Swiss-Prot record:
Name the record gives this protein: Protein GrpE
BP GO terms, sorted: protein folding
Family in the record: Belongs to the GrpE family.
SUPFAM superfamilies in the cross-refs: Coiled-coil domain of nucleotide exchange factor GrpE, Head domain of nucleotide exchange factor GrpE
Subcellular localization, as worded in the UniProt entry: Cytoplasm
Amino acid sequence: MVDNKDFNEELKENIQEELDNETKAENPNIDEEVEEVSEDIKADEKVIDFEELKALKEENTMFKSKTKKLENELEALKDRLLRISAEYENYRKRTDKEKERIYTDACEDVLIKMLPVLDNLERALAVDGTVEDLKKGVEMTVRQFEDALEKLQVEEISTENGFDPELHQAMMVVEQEGAEPNQVAQVFQKGYKRGDKVIRHSMVTVTK
């Protein structure tokens, strides 16, 4: 008995073979045409690959160009930073020297005005005389010292307008009959200022 499955397979193969033969009979060049189509497809694939490669090369060239441009810009920024750093360092050195010169000149100016006061004090100590003579010498030296402070634009801090924490330092608070509160009752140590700059606060007692 013949197997139906094998019979069907054999029948399909026979039919397919007959169809192929009929196709070849109608189109004797079918194999060549199929081969040409295959060659065209392969050629198209090569063209596609070439175009993609060309695009990649162009993209790579553009990337290299941008990279080179960025590298040049980076080098320019580095050079600029180095120049600015060098200029700042030179400026700092010049500023330090200028500050030192100003400080030295200021100290020299103060000493020039104060040394005569020291000279007079030394002369007063060297002279033999009465207490009155010594007192007169000290008074003269004090006046000379005050003149030197005036030339330096240094003035004594006033206490006439009452206690001011910006100018005075309260040592204690006292009761004083007939005095208004927050007034300077006594000055323990005078204060001095130059312009708006307080050199030394006045040490005072303040009324309640």
